[in-house]
């Protein structure tokens, strides 16, 4: 199963990083960083207009190499996103399958005033502290790879550190688990992480299970303005878009097109 492979690779890479820097050392670094309770990303999601999370990634398990490594100007991409006024920038940090890194996250976070999401397969508190130290304001928790106890523990830790959390679900059971864990933001991934097929109706089907006070994001498979209009009509607060923007030669125009601004 692809998801199992991703989790295994994530664990192996995390253990290698832990050998270089202990959890205790990370915690000491995090303790020197100011904790804000502003949660700007959540405020953006709560506004009337649909929010846009624009992703930076050069590869994925489903598409392979999206952008040639020689053309992967992640700093330039982040600047384009910021100029376009996106509500958050998602940075892949998974190394093996998405060819991301914490260094990319650190650079983007340091250069940008826009909230940054660490997009990874968070499986341990170590990775949450890493995200904080790297400058991230948002993390991702995937229900499918965590127990109920882990979900609650990691949500609590993230809140202590001033991090917003997108809790990602793919089916009815996972939505209910996210709600039970008191998630403030739930994201529905239209891409099945087990076989990477896209089912855009997933958001439509699962939206009704999420209480209105919980912010709701649709992730993956969003290609054009008509998709966004459909999502707006069913009460989606935000969209996460990766491949569509990464493949666009003019990223500002692509973002404006999805927003209906041109």
UniProtKB/Swiss-Prot annotation:
Disulfide bonds: none annotated. GO terms for molecular function: indole-3-glycerol-phosphate synthase activity; phosphoribosylanthranilate isomerase activity. InterPro entries: Aldolase_TIM (IPR013785), Indole-3-glycerol_P_synth (IPR045186), Indole-3-glycerol_P_synth_dom (IPR013798), Indole-3-GlycerolPSynthase_CS (IPR001468), RibuloseP-bd_barrel (IPR011060). It catalyses: 1-(2-carboxyphenylamino)-1-deoxy-D-ribulose 5-phosphate + H(+) = (1S,2R)-1-C-(indol-3-yl)glycerol 3-phosphate + CO2 + H2O. It comes from the Bacteria. Pfam families: IGPS. CDD domains: IGPS. Its EC number is 4.1.1.48. Keywords: Amino-acid biosynthesis, Aromatic amino acid biosynthesis, Decarboxylase, Lyase, Tryptophan biosynthesis. Signal peptide: none annotated. Gene3D superfamilies: Aldolase class I. The keyword Lipid metabolism does not apply. Pathway: Amino-acid biosynthesis; L-tryptophan biosynthesis; L-tryptophan from chorismate: step 4/5. One of its GO terms (biological process) is L-tryptophan biosynthetic process. HAMAP family: IGPS_B. Belongs to the TrpC family. This is Indole-3-glycerol phosphate synthase. It comes from Leuconostoc mesenteroides subsp. mesenteroides (strain ATCC 8293 / DSM 20343 / BCRC 11652 / CCM 1803 / JCM 6124 / NCDO 523 / NBRC 100496 / NCIMB 8023 / NCTC 12954 / NRRL B-1118 / 37Y). The gene is trpC.
């Amino acid at each position: 199963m692809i998801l199992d492979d991703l989790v295994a690779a994530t664990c192996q890479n995390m253990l290698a990083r832990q050998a270089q820097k202990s959890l205790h050392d990370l915690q000491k670094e995090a303790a020197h960083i100011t904790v804000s309770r502003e949660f700007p990303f959540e405020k953006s999601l709560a506004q009337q207009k649909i929010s846009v999370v624009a992703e930076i990634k050069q590869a994925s398990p489903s598409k392979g190499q999206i952008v040639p490594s020689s053309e992967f100007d992640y700093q330039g991409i982040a600047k384009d996103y910021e100029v376009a006024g996106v509500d958050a920038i998602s940075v892949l940090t998974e190394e093996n399958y998405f060819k991301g890194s914490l260094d990319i996250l650190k650079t983007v976070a340091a250069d940008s005033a826009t909230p940054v999401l660490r997009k990874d397969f968070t499986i341990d508190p170590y990775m949450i502290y890493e995200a904080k130290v790297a400058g991230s304001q948002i993390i991702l928790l995937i229900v499918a790879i965590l127990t109920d106890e882990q979900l609650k523990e990691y949500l609590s830790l993230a809140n202590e550190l001033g991090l917003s959390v997108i809790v990602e679900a793919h089916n009815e059971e996972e939505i209910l688990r996210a709600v039970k864990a008191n998630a403030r933001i739930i994201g529905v991934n239209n891409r099945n992480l087990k076989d990477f097929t896209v089912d855009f109706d997933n958001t439509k089907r699962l939206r009704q299970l999420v209480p209105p006070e919980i912010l709701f994001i649709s992730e993956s498979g969003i290609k054009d303005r008509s998709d966004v209009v459909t999502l707006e009509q069913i009460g989606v607060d935000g969209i996460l878009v990766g491949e569509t923007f990464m493949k666009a030669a003019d990223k500002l125009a692509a973002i404006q097109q999805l927003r209906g601004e041109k």
